[in-house]
Amino acid sequence: MDWKGRDVISIRDFSKEDIEIVLSTAERLEKELKEKGQLEYARGKILATLFFEPSTRTRLSFESAMHRLGGAVIGFAEASTSSVKKGESLADTIKTVEQYSDVIVIRHPKEGAARLAAEVAEIPVINAGDGSNQHPTQTLLDLYTIRKEFGKIDGLKIGLLGDLKYGRTVHSLAEALAYYDVELYLISPELLRMPRHIVEELREKGVTVYETSDLMSVIGELDVLYVTRIQKERFPDEQEYLKVRGSYQVNLQVLSKAKETLKVMHPLPRVDEIHPEVDKTKHAIYFKQVFNGIPVRMALLGLVLGVI
């Protein structure tokens, strides 16, 4: 696979070999970064970040990744500061921005927006989240985090907890985990179950999938608990949100029933689904997970720019 010029829109576009290339490249770049402090692979290259939706970690880690590679960054953090506010179409925005840059990272509230941007642009486009659809770079850093912690992904029992209906991070992660020999535990309120088509695809690919609303009944089985917040902004009906708000909280009492080796992950931001008392335990790796976004996004940028 020739990576130069490639778009990163959905984890579905990746083979297992593709995923392993990204993870291995990230591992190499992390080592180089620790040794040298600053790399120069992307010197003279410009990243454009187009964030039509709020972001802290994804936007800043992409910017940090590009700077660590020796490149430059332009862009906007909210649509109100762009000509979209004047009525400019997404297609015209993309065609304009690509004149100034070598790669585009886009986050947009509408599903399919990143795919549209990739169809319009002649430079690589990386999806930083499109509505409740996909978040492929988060998935890659999640896989990197799991592999880094356990030395493997195969053979693990992984629980996905919370908003499995609207959560784009868990949609992408579940699909990627189908490439590995894992057992998946899908833990959510009935109203927020994983979409049926994803569950059916997982089972067709041979993944063992358990579904439950009772966290305590499975917590002792898990190697990884991937927690997500229940996303108020994704609900079409506020009453539906109020029915499931605060469904779960991971705290010391919950973790007392877990394996000593359990690792707790979260794509962040959190609200109240993980109590702050968990932060200082050996289980919590969500801030390590945040850091891992830098080498993984460095790897993706370097690969699609053709500089590594």
Swiss-Prot record:
PROSITE patterns: CARBAMOYLTRANSFERASE (PS00097). Pathway: Pyrimidine metabolism; UMP biosynthesis via de novo pathway; (S)-dihydroorotate from bicarbonate: step 2/3. It catalyses: carbamoyl phosphate + L-aspartate = N-carbamoyl-L-aspartate + phosphate + H(+). One of its GO terms (biological process) is amino acid metabolic process. Keywords: Pyrimidine biosynthesis, Transferase. SUPFAM superfamilies: Aspartate/ornithine carbamoyltransferase. This is Aspartate carbamoyltransferase catalytic subunit.
